[in-house]
Amino acid sequence: MRPAPRWTGRTDGTTDEHLRWHQVVAPYAPGAEPNSCVFVGFASDEGVRRNKGRVGAAAGPDALRQAMAPMALDRPRRAYDAGTVEVVGEALEEGQRALGGTVAGLLDAGHFPVVFGGGHEIAYGTYLGVAGSSRRAPGTRLGILNLDAHFDLRADPVPSSGTPFRQILAAEGDAVRYAVLGISQPSNTAALFDTAARFGVRHLPDDECDPATALAFVDAFLAEIDLVYLTIDLDVLPAAVAPGVSAPAAFGVPLPTLQAVCDRVSASGKLAVVDVAELNPGLDIDNRTARTAARLIHRIVTRHVPVPAG
């Protein structure tokens, strides 16, 4: 685990009305106040490389921290940074297991983990954490909501950024519900649609994601589960909004619709963990993608995590 970097940014004052994220995020240590947000980085693009994508997402966690650090807070917040799980060389599976252990430990300690990627291979590591935590008690119906242009259900010979949800569904069967909002038909072969149908995957195409339809899709999904893992692949957004990804979207889901979806999930009381995938700073334009991702995470955390007492 790489230690948490220092969050820095503009300081207008130290009283509550002046606070920004960089002034409230502290290094995480066991025994930290429960019911807090804990940020974790996952520095990996080995899965993207294996999936024949454009590498660079390993730099995503720190770029996301830098974009979020100067954002102003409406009220005082309590947050921690647990550092970054770093995938060294080709040791993706080892990194995913390490991420899973970190996420499980945070959940068991009563925290809300927010994981910064990294390629979408992050998803298998985050899932291992949820599956291995006490939050998933016997009989708990776990759901994964993926905001993504791709199913990520490939049957590749080795795990990659294109395989995590097939790995999960192959292991879990009907014990996990999986839904994808924002699917781009031209970016997924007929074979992938067949795989999705075989696994019972619900999906909503990007060109049908008006706010009302998107929220109805999410409501139906949430009604069937007890616990939700939300994963946001930034290539679900239009390329003009999120150019800094391996596979920019020609169409994409508008940001206001995605924000409404995230609000609905946050308000459900079922959200256990969220991660953000595929931020590639080397492909970004004026930090546009990083700032958009930071805005979404800011919104989710401030809506989901209670304000500390006193």
UniProtKB/Swiss-Prot annotation:
Named cofactor requirement(s)? Mn(2+)
Superkingdom assignment:
Bacteria
> What's noted on cofactor binding?
Binds 2 manganese ions per subunit.
Kindly give the PROSITE patterns that the UniProt entry links to this protein: ARGINASE_1, ARGINASE_2
Q: Which amino acids does the record list as binding Mn(2+) 2?
A: D148, H150, D233, D235
| GO function terms (MF aspect) | agmatinase activity; formimidoylglutamase activity; manganese ion binding
Q: What is catalysed by this protein?
A: N-formimidoyl-L-glutamate + H2O = formamide + L-glutamate
Q: What is its EC number?
A: 3.5.3.8
Keywords attached to this Swiss-Prot or TrEMBL record, sorted alphabetically, are:
Histidine metabolism, Hydrolase, Manganese, Metal-binding
Family (UniProt): Belongs to the arginase family.
Name under which the protein is recorded: Formimidoylglutamase
Source taxonomy: Bacteria, Bacillati, Actinomycetota, Actinomycetes, Mycobacteriales
